[in-house]
Amino acid sequence: MAGHSKWANIKHRKAAQDAKRGKLFTKFIRELTVSAREGGSDPDSNPRLRIAIDKALGGNMTRDTIERAIKRGAGELEGQQLETIIYEGYGPGGTAVMVETMTDNRNRTVSGVRNAFSKSGGNLGTDGSVAYLFTKRGVLSYAPGTDEDALMDAALEAGAEDVVSYDDGAIDVFTEPTAFYEVKDALDAAGFVSDNAEIAMIASTKAELDAETAEKFMRLIDTLEEHDDVQEVYHNAEISDEIMESLG
């Protein structure tokens, strides 16, 4: 979003909605379970699991609950079998949207995702239809007031790819996925604690939306995120701070 950290408005809005709907713990447990199943139960050798653990702890999930989810994923406890499926589509204003889901029922999930796109005036695409517009990168976000020069020096020395500052003082540090925790640990040790840290799909091009289109687009995002099987939604929409504020 213009002059503002790409993640700030929609991420904060999303987190508030997730908490309000009581969905955060469900999402944490699913991510912990699938991460452990696909990459093993040791977070030191499974970066995806380590990120999931950090997010769960940040959301006040108990270590006991986290451990049970990991054991379930590793096959030490019984539980539902989930698989990760990525859906791609086009939203209002020609926006590119990627929807990461975890499900035990493909038919239920694809039906819900397709319906969300259709209701917003968009359409669900085929595999690869928008994926080429996104690159997987690590993102570390820092609040306004952070010493930009010191953070940039520390980040680049630690192996970050890029450091982007915004008009309001917010800063994003971008990394290769494989270097994410090396950079994060170095910055943590240097006293730079991020507001948000994740490996995400970053769009290479943006679609700027006017107020009317932005309202339709956010309705699509809300509908997708209300679906129990949806874990993350990535997109290339560019929405100004003023429009985001008007949307609430």
Swiss-Prot record:
<dbReference type="InterPro" id="IPR002876">
    <property type="entry name" value="Transcrip_reg_TACO1-like"/>
</dbReference>
<comment type="similarity">
    <text>Belongs to the TACO1 family.</text>
</comment>
<dbReference type="GO" id="GO:0006355">
    <property type="term" value="P:regulation of DNA-templated transcription"/>
</dbReference>
<protein>
    <recommendedName>
        <fullName>Probable transcriptional regulatory protein SO_2432</fullName>
    </recommendedName>
</protein>
<dbReference type="Pfam" id="PF20772">
    <property type="entry name" value="TACO1_YebC_N"/>
</dbReference>
<dbReference type="GO" id="GO:0005829">
    <property type="term" value="C:cytosol"/>
</dbReference>
<keyword id="KW-0963">Cytoplasm</keyword>
<keyword id="KW-0804">Transcription</keyword>
<dbReference type="InterPro" id="IPR049083">
    <property type="entry name" value="TACO1_YebC_N"/>
</dbReference>
<keyword id="KW-0238">DNA-binding</keyword>
<dbReference type="InterPro" id="IPR017856">
    <property type="entry name" value="Integrase-like_N"/>
</dbReference>
<dbReference type="InterPro" id="IPR026564">
    <property type="entry name" value="Transcrip_reg_TACO1-like_dom3"/>
</dbReference>
<dbReference type="Pfam" id="PF01709">
    <property type="entry name" value="Transcrip_reg"/>
</dbReference>
<dbReference type="InterPro" id="IPR029072">
    <property type="entry name" value="YebC-like"/>
</dbReference>
<dbReference type="GO" id="GO:0003677">
    <property type="term" value="F:DNA binding"/>
</dbReference>
<dbReference type="InterPro" id="IPR048300">
    <property type="entry name" value="TACO1_YebC-like_2nd/3rd_dom"/>
</dbReference>
<keyword id="KW-0805">Transcription regulation</keyword>
